[in-house]
Amino acid sequence: MSEKEYVVIVKADVDLEAFDAEVAADTGSGQIPNRAVTVANPRIGSKRMTHWMLTDEEAETLAQDERVVAVEIPPDQRTDMEIGLHARQTSVFERQSGNNSTWVNWGLRRCTETTNIFADATTLTGDYLYALDGTGVDFIVQDSGIQADHPEFQDAAGTTRVQQIDWFAGSGIVGETQDSNFYTDYDGHGTHCAGISVGKTFGWAKNARIYAQKLGGLEGTADPNTGISITNAFDCIRLWHNNKSGADANRPTVVNMSWGYGFSTTSDPTSGTYRGTAWTYGVDYTTRAALETATGVSIKRLNSATTTRLSTRNATVDAEIEDMISAGIHVVIAAGNNYNKVEASGGADYDNNVVFGSTVNYHRGSSPYSSNAYMVASLDSTTQDDGGTEKDKTSIFSSRGPGCNIWAPGSNIMSACCTPYNTSKYSPIAYFGNGSFYQMSISGTSMAAPQVAGLLCLHLESDPTLTPAQLKSKIIADSKDVVYNTGVNNDYDQISTSTFGQDAKILYTRYASANALSITKE
């Protein structure tokens, strides 16, 4: 049987060096192959992973070792799952949509209030008050790239804050080359997300230092494959963060990840298991609507109702996130736009599965995932009447549930766009400050996550010594429990109102000063 590259992920308390020595030895016992196994990638930036050349049988056996979390094909090489961005053009969602050069990210205004000050209105003209601007903090957008010369990313002197570093040189990884077009965003998604976090008009951290990491698979259709592979991307960030020295030694790092993995199909399922009970499609449930109402397997909604996209997890990517957080990096992740419930480990829906040829645990959310990161669900730009009070509610597309931990505005969010941009996805307008650049309003949990990432930069400016755990505890404690909630955790067909059991906590900041910004929500 031929060998192929596998990622071996060990548990957090396992001595990886000692484990690897066993795998590389000429002889092995137990689940360790009885031969000297060749290293495919030593992963010098990881404390939990090494890539080995194994046969399928050896990989299956090694996965049974009590020290191992998982043995799987590297995410870049998998064909049973796909990487994607968590945003869609606003007009898809049948809400008030469009573009206007006077509009500003309404999340800035909403998250400085303890309750919904918009009521049921779509427009609010007032002041966004702020005292902090992210000075002294390093922000990374891991996405489709960034337009480095966009005016949104300039400092007060008109100089770009985007640091166009070579990630391999900065991390010390040898044998890899960063493409000359790495700092061109051919899509627009990454530029938009960065604008929400650190834009000087649309963003929270208006003076944070900006870094961009274009991720392979997210580059956009016009991009000539200039991104960094998943495997290298996480190592680059960890090692670069650990290598900070001199005046930069104590600068905190915040990473926004508005992307995730999913499984797409145009077929009907054959069977599955819901809360421990097996079912067969066509017998127990004869329509997709009945199946969704009973089990939460989403009906076909995407691409003119022909494609179902389910969230999927990848142990390799999730372990990468844990390693980043352990290194002191603050990680923010978009929950996804798959309409799905994201159950917490051990919850009633965590082991639900559906068979579409392969078996998918569809209520675990999508990778990247970590309960120690900020898993961000999206608030809508419309509200829900609750006994005469207009309450914030979930965006219809948003994945949400006990496996997520905070809500932030994600529908109809105005921010920067790049040139060139993805014409098949976006319809930007001229940037209000310079007609040679673009801005646009789009929706997604992709837009909710960078609201959180931007606010983290403000907290870290105030106290750069905060660990990821300390700051997460503070952010969650400060959040306001005001999202409309049906009170039911399995009303899966109520996708426009139900939180699916997620805490109703909205991102909130108490920072304020006399500095004012006129703002309009549309």
Task: Describe each model-derived feature in a short phrase.
Residues V10-A12, I73-D76, V141-G145, I196-K200, ...:
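Active-site-proximal beta-strand/loop segments in catalytic clefts of secreted hydrolases
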Residues G216-S370, G433-P450:
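Substrate-binding/access-modulating region of protease and related hydrolase catalytic domains
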Residues I32-N41, Q64-V137, P151-E152, Q502-A504, ...:
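Protease zymogen maturation seam
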Residues N99-V104, L124-N232, S245-V254, F263-P269, ...:
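Subtilisin-like serine protease catalytic core
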Residues M1, A194-S197, Y211-L218, T253, ...:
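Hydrolase catalytic cores
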Residues D143, I329, V355-E461:
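Extracellular S/T/G-rich loop segment that most often corresponds to the catalytic His/Ser-adjacent loop
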